[in-house]
């Protein structure tokens, strides 16, 4: 299968290159960006020498349609919403890593403060959390966000089984700096990040409606959640710490059973007896989940950790590609966590 990447110079685009280089069924045939056009990717990023020596090209939908069988959009929000339309009209498969096709138009505009894609385009896309969405044969995939992935995988088994008081959910999520993308900003300046810890977009992060929308598919009465996001002084990784109260007569063994039922046959979710750590998933497509119960307060704490650039972006995108095509779900994704 031949694929193209739009948004090649961003963190997620570069991670896609590394993954696809090890994918037995995929050939990367073109790469596109607005920067460094005409230069070989390996000249811009020498660590990719011998991995990807393709030249970066301007975006040209027709050229991609002629060359490839599928396109990945690894672009900032607000880009794919306009560029994807030509592909949809041509019935040409898309996996969009941005948030442009995850939400209804009015919700997207409210939370992203940008013009949404047309409703007829949005209706074509399937929101694809790999462990829960049947995407075989689908053509248009909205890849979940990084915070959303970690949080949803932690909560869906408990919400679906009716084990927790959904109005008690509090999520304290923390991300490495790559989650903010490459755009220059005061908050990502080295002197503001190094040896620091800061909360941002409190109650206003754009992944909040995505998470609630997904959970409501498992409990129609699911209310809004309290959700905070903070920046960690690390390059990559997300830790979502979820607090919730158990319903009456629910035992800790019921929680363990719910996670086992949900994930025992899922190759990229590891439910652990110990509490997860970022180092154990960095460089991989794994999600590690652990939990602990406080009998005095009736509060269950669930911790979910992922690599924000892999399971939270490019890794899950390739996982979805594999599922779309009916291939082995793990193809191209046999990355051992780097740990250090």
UniProtKB/Swiss-Prot annotation:
One of its GO terms (cellular component) is cytoplasm. It is found in: Cytoplasm. SUPFAM superfamilies: Glyceraldehyde-3-phosphate dehydrogenase-like, C-terminal domain (SSF55347), NAD(P)-binding Rossmann-fold domains (SSF51735). Its EC number is 1.2.1.38. One of its GO terms (biological process) is L-arginine biosynthetic process. It catalyses: N-acetyl-L-glutamate 5-semialdehyde + phosphate + NADP(+) = N-acetyl-L-glutamyl 5-phosphate + NADPH + H(+). Its main location: cytoplasm. One of its GO terms (molecular function) is N-acetyl-gamma-glutamyl-phosphate reductase activity. The active site is at 146. Belongs to the NAGSA dehydrogenase family. Type 1 subfamily. Catalyzes the NADPH-dependent reduction of N-acetyl-5-glutamyl phosphate to yield N-acetyl-L-glutamate 5-semialdehyde. HAMAP family: ArgC_type1. This is N-acetyl-gamma-glutamyl-phosphate reductase. It comes from Streptococcus thermophilus (strain ATCC BAA-250 / LMG 18311). The lineage of its organism: Bacteria, Bacillati, Bacillota, Bacilli, Lactobacillales. The gene is argC.
């Amino acid at each position: 299968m031949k694929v193209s990447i739009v948004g090649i110079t961003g963190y997620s685009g570069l991670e896609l290159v590394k993954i696809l280089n090890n994918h037995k069924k995929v050939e990367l045939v073109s790469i596109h960006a607005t920067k460094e056009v005409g230069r070989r990717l390996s000249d811009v990023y020498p660590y990719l020498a011998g991995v990807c020596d393709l030249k970066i090209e301007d975006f040209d939908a027709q050229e991609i349609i002629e060359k490839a069988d599928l396109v990945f959009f690894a672009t900032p929000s607000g880009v794919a919403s306009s560029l994807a339309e030509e592909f949809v009209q041509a019935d040409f498969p898309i996996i969009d890593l941005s948030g442009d096709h995850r939400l209804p138009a009015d919700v997207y505009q409210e939370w992203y403060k940008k013009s949404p894609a047309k409703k007829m385009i949005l209706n074509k896309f399937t929101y694809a959390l790999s462990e829960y969405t049947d995407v075989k044969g689908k053509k248009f995939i909205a890849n979940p966000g990084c915070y959303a992935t970690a949080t949803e995988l932690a909560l869906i088994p408990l919400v679906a089984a009716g084990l927790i008081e959904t109005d008690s959910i509090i999520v304290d999520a923390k991300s490495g700096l790559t989650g903010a993308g490459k755009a220059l900003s005061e908050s990502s300046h080295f002197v503001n990040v190094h040896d620091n810890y800061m909360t941002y977009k409190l109650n206003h992060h754009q992944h909040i409606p995505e998470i609630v929308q997904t959970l409501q598919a498992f409990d129609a009465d699911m209310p809004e959640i309290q959700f905070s996001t903070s920046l960690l002084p690390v390059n990559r990784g997300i830790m979502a710490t979820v607090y919730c109260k158990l319903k009456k007569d629910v035992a800790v063994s019921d929680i363990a059973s719910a996670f086992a039922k949900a994930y025992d046959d899922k190759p990229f979710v590891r439910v652990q007896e110990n509490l997860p750590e970022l180092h154990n998933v960095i460089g991989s497509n794994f999600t590690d989940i652990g939990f602990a119960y406080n009998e005095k307060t009736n509060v269950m704490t669930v911790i979910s950790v992922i690599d924000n650039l892999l399971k939270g972006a490019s890794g899950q995108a390739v996982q979805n590609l594999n599922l779309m095509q009916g291939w082995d779900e793990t193809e191209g994704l046999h990355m051992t966590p780097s740990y250090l």
